[in-house]
């Protein structure tokens, strides 16, 4: 597939997601990184977003709950270039009914080449990077070329 470049803005669009068993850990991480996070545009699946907003006072655009389609809503935003970073504290030891949606969200994040943090360690590395506060060029699929090949 041909590639093109997309410029991520200095103020990133960050999606925050957590499975139920991981919500307390994400909340703790968000509280620890509130100062950094408030400089960016925040999105989340429904339950996670409402909990984080209530507990931290951060402005978060909440989708619907993950199992009800929120993961897919975030995936659509990623494919439209409207999400720059995904922080997804998922529980690898417990299956959830919407596992196919979870896999699809992680797959689409990889397709569109956005950074993904799946635990505290990767989130720390990502949010301690100076690139978080800078414009960054990333390679993404050239959808126009992809479409032209198929027409």
UniProtKB/Swiss-Prot annotation:
Binding site for substrate: 19, 23, 45-48, 65-66, 98
Domain MGS-like: 6-151
Disulfide-bond pairs as recorded: none
Keywords, alphabetical: Lyase
Membrane-crossing segments per the record: none
Catalysis performed (reactions): dihydroxyacetone phosphate = methylglyoxal + phosphate
GO molecular-function terms, A-Z: methylglyoxal synthase activity
Catalytic residues in the record: 71
A UniProt-annotated Pfam family: MGS
Enzyme category, top tier: lyase
E.C. number: 4.2.3.3
InterPro entries reported for this sequence: Methylgl_synth, Methylglyoxal_synth_AS, MGS-like_dom, MGS-like_dom_sf
GO BP, sorted A to Z: methylglyoxal biosynthetic process
GO cellular component, one term: cytosol
Function as written in the Swiss-Prot or TrEMBL entry: Catalyzes the formation of methylglyoxal from dihydroxyacetone phosphate.
HAMAP family in alphabetical order: Methylglyoxal_synth (MF_00549)
Family statement: Belongs to the methylglyoxal synthase family.
Name of the protein in its database record: Methylglyoxal synthase
Species of origin: Vibrio parahaemolyticus serotype O3:K6 (strain RIMD 2210633)
């Amino acid at each position: 597939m041909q590639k093109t470049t997309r410029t991520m803005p200095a103020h990133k669009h960050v999606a925050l997601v957590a499975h139920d068993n991981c919500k307390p850990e994400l909340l703790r991480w968000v509280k620890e990184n509130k100062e950094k996070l408030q400089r960016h545009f925040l999105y989340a699946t429904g339950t996670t977003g409402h909990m984080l907003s209530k507990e931290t006072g951060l402005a978060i655009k909440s989708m619907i709950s993950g199992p009800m389609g929120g993961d897919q809503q975030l995936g659509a935003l990623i494919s439209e270039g409207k999400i720059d970073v995904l922080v997804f504290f998922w529980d690898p030891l417990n299956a959830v009914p919407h596992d196919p949606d979870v896999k699809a969200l992680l797959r689409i994040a990889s397709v569109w080449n956005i950074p993904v943090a799946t635990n505290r360690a990767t989130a720390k590395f990502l949010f301690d990077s100076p690139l978080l506060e800078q414009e960054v060029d990333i390679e993404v699929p050239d959808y126009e070329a992809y479409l032209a090949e198929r027409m």
